[in-house]
Structure formats: structure tokens, C-alpha cells
């Protein structure tokens, strides 16, 4: 079946769904509308989909640290969220990338690999395709991250490493603290 044959591509569930509903699948040049269609060894399966989106481009300047045909790495400043919200926010990193693509006449997708909180600054990797996003997200646990944090209270050392689980501070949506119920950073 087509759906079994494409498993070798390790497509994300979301991308496979997008291909089935909004894209095109052909087997030996013939368009297929049923993922359960039988295929044989040697059949040529072609998957087509669009990276177009309805993101509103913005003129927010970007601090680009690296770019190639597959990805974009942006230094996100404080006060910016990654994705547009249901309330219609257009001052997000995704909107800024859409604006950059429009100005540079780049036709690519906008797929952030991970998110940083609104007030957290740092590098954000943006894949230019859904397949690239999936491939990079599989290596998520191999990415080294280092955070610099402001702390309050008495500290024995001027600098150091906090290697403890962190979680949200009670009643605060964007403040974090060391806590037994937290997660490893």
C-alpha cells in the first residue's frame, strides 16, 4: 500500500496528512486518492505538497546568524513570541521570517524546530521545509543548549551552573524556578 511504502521516508504525521488532503500522490504517473492503493516493487511513488502558508509578513528586522537552502538560524530578541496567536498577533518571529522571505523573494516554508519563551533570547532554528523540520526535530535531544539566567537571593559564587529540574513559578506564566516537580532543562 502507498501509506506503507512512504513510511521509509519517516514523514511526520502532520506532513503526511497535509500531503493526503492538500497535496498530490502519484504512482507511476497516475494520481492516487487512496493511501491504501496497492503498490509493487519498482513502482514510482511521487509526493507533492506546497510550502505556502497564510502567515502575514511583517517588517520586523531579523538578526540572522546562519542561512542555507535548508535552514535559517535567527537570534530571537526578548519580548517576541515564535508563532502568531489566535488573537491575531503579527509581531512574531514567524511573521518576521515571512517578511524576510518576501523581501528576499525566497519561496520556502517556515518551520521553527523549537520555541523560546517570550522573554528568552537566543538562537532559533527554522527549517525551510516540513521534511527538514521533521528531520531536525528527531535530533532534538542532541542539540546542546546553554542558558544564562538572572537569579535573586544570596549566591556563594559569582557564576556557576544550576543542574537541577526547573518548572514554572506558581502564578507566573513566564517565570521559572528550581523545583522537584520541574523538568531537566
In which residue ranges do the predicted regions lie?
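RNA pseudouridine synthases
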Residues: 1-185
Amino acid at each position: 500500500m502507498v501509506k506503507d511504502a512512504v513510511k521509509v521516508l519517516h514523514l511526520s504525521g502532520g506532513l503526511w496528512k497535509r500531503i493526503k488532503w492538500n497535496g498530490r500522490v502519484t504512482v507511476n504517473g497516475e494520481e492516487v486518492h487512496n493511501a491504501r492503493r496497492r503498490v509493487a516493487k519498482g513502482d514510482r511513488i511521487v509526493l507533492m505538497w506546497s510550502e505556502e502558508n497564510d502567515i502575514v509578513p511583517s517588517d520586523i528586522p531579523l538578526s540572522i546568524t546562519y542561512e542555507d537552502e535548508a535552514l535559517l538560524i535567527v537570534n530571537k530578541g526578548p519580548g517576541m513570541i515564535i508563532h502568531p496567536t489566535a488573537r491575531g498577533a503579527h509581531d512574531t518571529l514567524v511573521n518576521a521570517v515571512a517578511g524576510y522571505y518576501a523581501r528576499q523573494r525566497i519561496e520556502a516554508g517556515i518551520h521553527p524546530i523549537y520555541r523560546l519563551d517570550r522573554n528568552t533570547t537566543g538562537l532559533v532554528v527554522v527549517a525551510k521545509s516540513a521534511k527538514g523540520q521533521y528531520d531536525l526535530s528527531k535530533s532534538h535531544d542532541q542539540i546542546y543548549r546553554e542558558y544564562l539566567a538572572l537569579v535573586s537571593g544570596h549566591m556563594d559564587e559569582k557564576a556557576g551552573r544550576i543542574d537541577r529540574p526547573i518548572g514554572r513559578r506558581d502564578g507566573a506564566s513566564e517565570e521559572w524556578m528550581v523545583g522537584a516537580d520541574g523538568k531537566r532543562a
